[in-house]
């Protein structure tokens, strides 16, 4: 998935303190708006609880205060990926091959920006998704947002 330059810089700054605490940095989202939000997704083999999120928030806040990469006021949110886990990297798609995914594309493919189907494969920077009986291939750089579809 194509990250903005700011998101790339933030990922570089945030990954070290998150990993030093023993967590996996799943990904980040920076949402601009009236009140901008920096959302950090973390995970671990044992799962994530509120204390884990607080620890990461404290460490990341310290780094952000020193480095100051965001020039506007923002809220910091730290959470687990949840059931509708967002996906950010080719490794995420490969890990969840066979699972259902919902995609929002940056640029339409076949006049559609929203797609949902089963992840079939990942090759380099391309993902193949089975959609309504057809295999559709998407460039990761064209995926604006991707989430697993939970089944209950």
From Swiss-Prot:
It is found in: Cytoplasm. SUPFAM superfamilies: YhbC-like, C-terminal domain, YhbC-like, N-terminal domain. It comes from the Bacteria. Coiled coil: none annotated. GO terms for cellular component: cytosol. InterPro entries: Ribosome_maturation_RimP, RimP_C, RimP_C_sf, RimP_N, RimP_N_sf. Keywords: Cytoplasm, Ribosome biogenesis. Its main location: cytoplasm. GO terms for biological process: ribosomal small subunit assembly; translation. Pfam families: DUF150_C, RimP_N. Belongs to the RimP family. HAMAP family: RimP. Required for maturation of 30S ribosomal subunits. This is Ribosome maturation factor RimP. It comes from Erwinia tasmaniensis (strain DSM 17950 / CFBP 7177 / CIP 109463 / NCPPB 4357 / Et1/99).
């Amino acid at each position: 998935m194509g990250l903005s330059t700011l998101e790339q810089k933030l990922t570089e700054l945030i990954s070290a303190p998150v990993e030093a605490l023993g967590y996996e940095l799943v990904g980040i989202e920076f949402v601009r708006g009236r009140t901008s939000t920096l959302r950090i997704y973390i995970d671990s083999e044992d799962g994530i609880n509120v204390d884990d999120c607080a620890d990461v928030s404290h460490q990341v806040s310290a780094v952000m205060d020193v480095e100051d990469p965001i020039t506007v006021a923002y809220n910091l949110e730290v959470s687990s990926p949840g059931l509708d886990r967002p996906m950010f990297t080719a490794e995420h798609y490969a890990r969840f091959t066979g699972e259902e995914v919902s995609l929002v594309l940056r640029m339409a493919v076949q006049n559609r920006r929203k797609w949902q189907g089963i992840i079939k494969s990942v090759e380099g920077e391309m993902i193949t998704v089975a959609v309504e009986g057809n295999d559709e291939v998407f460039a990761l750089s064209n995926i604006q947002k991707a989430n697993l579809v939970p089944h209950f």
